[in-house]
Amino acid sequence: VIQGFGNVGSNLAEHLYNRDNAKIIAVGESNGYLYNKNGINIDNLKKFYKKNKNINNKNLGKFYNKPEKLLELECDILIPAALENAITLKNVKKIKTKMIIEAANGPVSFEADEELNRRGIIVLPDIYVNAGGVVVSYFEWVKNISHIRFGRVEKRFQEHKILDLINLIDQKTKVKTNPELISKIIHGANEEDLAYSGSEDSMRNAFNEILQVKKKIKKSFR
């Protein structure tokens, strides 16, 4: 369930839907939320939103005009990506999820966080969740000061190594590898691939460090 379909919410929904095959059952905006228990087609919703500037698409799900009820839907992961203090002591007891990912700034109040922690609901804090953008900005800064794009130095070297290996396999098996398949195999990572890989590695390492501290002090992730 995702609250907010702006720049953060829509792109997050797109990545979860296409890269991770996540089932997104509800998406909310300020005037209500779209719900489909079988999952919303996010690609179609993004096209609709771009054209109509709203998410009220009856072909993709049922629209409810009570935006505050979105947060009370039962789900595995709840992602507030719009409002500060979306979850407070006023509605925290109605939250029915296993994990909350704070994609907005401060969507869960301190008091609500303590209650959620007591109930065993994991809350990934905004200061961690939103760090990915800073990490990628750092990569861009490093690239700019070095005046060389990522992957340029080793790209051809890696391609030749893989091509030599394919040729060796062809010789031993006496079977010629399809040229189209060879092209796919030797295709090196582009800058976007490297940015994803680098940011994922940084976020994984950061999470493991946070997790170790959490276990040591026996508190919430916040």
What spans do the regions from the language model cover?
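Glycine-rich phosphate/diphosphate-binding loop of Rossmann-like nucleotide-binding domains
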Residues: 1-72
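Generic beta-strand/beta-sheet core signal
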Residues: 3, 11, 28-30, 80-82, ...
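Short glycine/serine/threonine-rich phosphate/pyrophosphate-binding segments
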Residues: 8-12, 86-89, 108-110, 132-133
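Short, surface-exposed basic-aromatic patches at helix termini and helix-loop junctions that form
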Residues: 16-19, 92-94, 114-121
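Structural motif
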Residues: 22-26, 76-77, 98-100, 121-122
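Short, flexible loop segments at the rims of nucleotide/cofactor-binding pockets, characterized by
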Residues: 55-59, 77-80, 100-102
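Rossmann-fold NAD(P) dinucleotide-binding segment
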Residues: 65-75, 83-101
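Adenosine-phosphate binding glycine-rich loop
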Residues: 98-222
